[in-house]
């Protein structure tokens, strides 16, 4: 096998995927069977500058080069050869946000990431005018907010794109976006994709909504500011000499490899979990948390709790996105991990690792003496604002009444319930729309501990929750699969994934247990009733507040860093 893979690498018959997550940039190399054979990564952090979360373009360049160099080093260590070209290449990144450039291609203001929630007036006016929910983090909301705030750079804007779009342009010279990533900038036209064997079809931004938004925002040609939209399987350019040198300044990487359309991390998460067909969905749990369900029919009305995006093939997807995920669980794990470490130091016992800490805590969450409703405890994981529940400035809180059963099991169950509560509120809207879901696939570092997280998520969402072996490979693997799909457009993407890529069944499916469902609903009722406490807590602590997680919290737990490849 080693000799065969070595020859495939030499011949350029491998496929490269790179994804820029919020805490890690990962490069993944797969063989012709789409099996990962090498990887490289680079840790990075967003910066909080002048009231906004950002990454510098210098950090993007440095991080990409470091991740790619680490992959090359891994290939050299394993196989004794250096890759010079690839069968195909794909790039993906965290969605949304705002990268505005002038006519010379110069960045006008620092990159505004999806974490920024200062676009409330713009998002509200756009949503009302379009009859379509425009979330705070969408690119069009950032653009309009800049107009409303009379920012000087607006007059110089020649183009707006996403992080994946920017990187793809540096590699190929093309100003394009995959439809999934584009759907986080501005709404995509409805209806089925007109495609056939060898022809992936086409999608574009909704033209009627573009006209309405253009009048509202007051720009002369809104469409010209946005990238060309491409569906999965469409040709999206090839690696240029300049692009090859930008990614690999050693000069070893040769130009010419084809690239697939750049995608967002939501789309690569769908691919990594085999969830691009109607009635399927996936849940990603990391520092943020989101669920996506592929729709059979359009929603009957706009809902502020739901984003409507698309799969990489252009099919409509309802997304519930929550800014806050498992970071509070990670925080408690660090506390109890340090307790275990200190106890070991004091007694001379063998110390335990973080995975054992998680396993012990999460087992307590479903122990026989743990209450299904967490015994009266209540946990808010709001390290940042939370648009789904209309919390502008969040505070992590643990609440309990004097009569609550304050046990370890109830504490952990409350924290897990709290991590899933905002997601469940959004999913309740989907249930009200009569959206049918056969199964959802979960992925993220939290699910490295088998059993209780999967079981409690099934109860919270009231749907079966599956785990796929490939879900842990992350978005870099997902975009590599999309790059490989360039040669398989004789099949629909959903068929390609089901028949060629996956083939087997999920490792395990957890069905919702009635007692867990009832317990979670009781917990959720208390959670909704206590939401006003957030405003009080924020008002009392605002002098030292920020609008997002601190860097120590955001990147402290490798279990969450692993997931953030597929935010």
Question: For the regions a protein language model found, what residue spans apply to each?
Answer:
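Conserved phosphate-binding catalytic cores of ATP/NTP-utilizing and phosphoryl-transfer enzymes
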Residues: 2-11, 77-80, 142-149, 241-251, ...
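Glycine/Thr-rich phosphate-binding loops that ligate phosphate moieties of nucleotide
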Residues: 1-41, 48, 84-124, 233, ...
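Active-site nucleophile and cofactor-binding loops and adjacent substrate-binding regions
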Residues: 34, 55, 59, 87-94, ...
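Acidic, glycine-rich loop-and-beta core segments that form the ion-binding/anion-interacting portion
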Residues: 262-302, 306-310
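Short acidic, glycine/serine/threonine-rich loops at helix termini
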Residues: 99-103, 171-175, 181-182, 189-192, ...
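N-terminal phosphate-binding loop and adjacent alpha-helix
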Residues: 40-81, 131
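Gly/Ser/Thr-rich active-site cleft segment
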Residues: 20-22, 133-263, 412, 416-417
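Phosphate/pyrophosphate-binding loops at sites that engage ATP/ADP/AMP, CoA/4′-phosphopantetheine
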Residues: 66-86, 150-154, 211-222, 247-250, ...
